Amino acid sequence: MNTNNSVPAPPFHCDDTTDLLPYLQGMIGEIKKSGCTRFLSITLETGYSDPLAILEEIHRPGQAVCYLERPATEFSIACGGLVAEAAFSGEKRFSQAKNWANSIFEMTPIVGNHKFPGTGPTLFIAATFESESTREVSPKPLQVFLPRWQVLRKGGQNFIIYNTEMNAVSSPAS
């Protein structure tokens, strides 16, 4: 996307003092020129955060969520909301999902420090053992989503990740 260097380099480290406005203005300018849609993932390092407590506080019924925890490795992550989602069935569902995931990652600039798994854009899945839905009300055999938000705690470091869709009518101020 940055072929003519009109978009400043994304900040590698983000905290509450990081000014993202120049980067966002440049990115939206490029999107307007190209007419394409992009996703954006911003990782912000924070003080202490408890992913499960945050999930419990902001979860709304019907909202896609996920929570994973590995106490032995001091790892926990919670996520919610949908920025992008897809469902797959049939014998090639995993290869189709991989292609979809690669296309999402190709159009997702990453801002901030993404040194741990779970920082930066992270796709979450739900899968059944069946290749096809057995009933009309059954979940699809493979569902994948990019969440709107993620909260990660890893070995004493804490991160909040915000994912969003950017298009020609996006505003860097909102």
Per-segment meaning from a language model:
Residues 1-174:
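Signature of the chorismate-utilizing enzyme
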